[in-house]
């Protein structure tokens, strides 16, 4: 922890990785021909690239200031990014237009920004929209790959597999259902995905990204003072910060 310009210098500066990644995405799509909704310069690719860039400044505001408003900006940037993949998948499996996709996206972002600002983490209703959106992304990818009328219902149960990866088992969920009421959102993709998507996808980068994210999360746990108070990675003055590594890997 520093008394200088940045309260957490390493954890602040490692956010440059998101900005570099986002700018590279925008550079790449601006130099390629458009062959689907996620190639070439269009409303969706520009939105995606810009939100990746904003992950950097959003997190910088939190780690650089250690303030409540900085935490709000950080959480907002994370939500602005993570809702895009599952909303995009729903767009591809529904009758949504691009403008409908954008209107839904903007509505969710504004709702979260206001509720997070007024009521703090959980928005006063015990909903971690970022965490739930990780599950919705996996669920919607599963449904995209295996879409059928019956899979629209079955896909919701994939959310429990995601929870188990993060150490939360069904027994805990149903014993504390008041805290996990948000599992009902696991069936949201199935409800909205009314048609089989066109085309197919390759998933090598999807699984590579998920692997990097899980590795980053495991490293992040090592630097979490609440979970590992005696860990060498919890030294705030060290140049090697687990949270900084988390930033680099997730970028």
What kind of region is each of these model predictions?
Residues 1-185, 192-205, 211-251:
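Early transmembrane hairpin module of multi-pass membrane proteins
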């Amino acid at each position: 922890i520093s008394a200088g310009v940045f309260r957490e210098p390493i954890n602040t500066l490692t956010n440059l990785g998101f900005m570099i990644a986002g700018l590279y995405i925008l550079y790449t799509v601006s130099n390629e021909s458009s062959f689907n909704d996620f190639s070439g310069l269009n409303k969706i690719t520009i939105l995606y690239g810009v939100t990746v860039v904003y992950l950097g400044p959003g997190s910088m505001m939190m780690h650089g200031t250690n303030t409540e408003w900085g935490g709000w900006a950080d959480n907002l940037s994370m939500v602005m990014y993570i809702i895009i993949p599952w909303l995009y998948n729903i767009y591809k499996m529904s009758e949504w237009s691009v403008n409908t996709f954008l209107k839904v996206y903007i509505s969710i972002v504004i709702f979260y920004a206001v509720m997070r600002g007024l009521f703090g983490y959980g928005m006063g209703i015990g909903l971690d929209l970022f965490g739930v959106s990780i599950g919705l992304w996996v669920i919607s990818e599963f449904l995209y790959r295996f879409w059928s009328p019956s899979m629209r219902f079955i896909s919701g149960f994939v959310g429990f597999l995601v929870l188990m990866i993060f150490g939360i088992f069904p027994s805990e969920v149903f014993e504390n259902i008041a805290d996990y009421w948000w599992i009902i959102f696991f069936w949201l993709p199935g409800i909205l995905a009314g048609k089989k998507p066109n085309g197919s996808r390759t998933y090598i980068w999807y699984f590579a990204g998920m692997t990097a994210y899980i590795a980053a999360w495991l490293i992040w746990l090592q630097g979490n003072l609440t979970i590992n108070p005696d860990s060498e990675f919890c030294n705030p003055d060290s140049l090697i910060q687990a949270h900084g590594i988390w930033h680099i890997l997730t970028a």
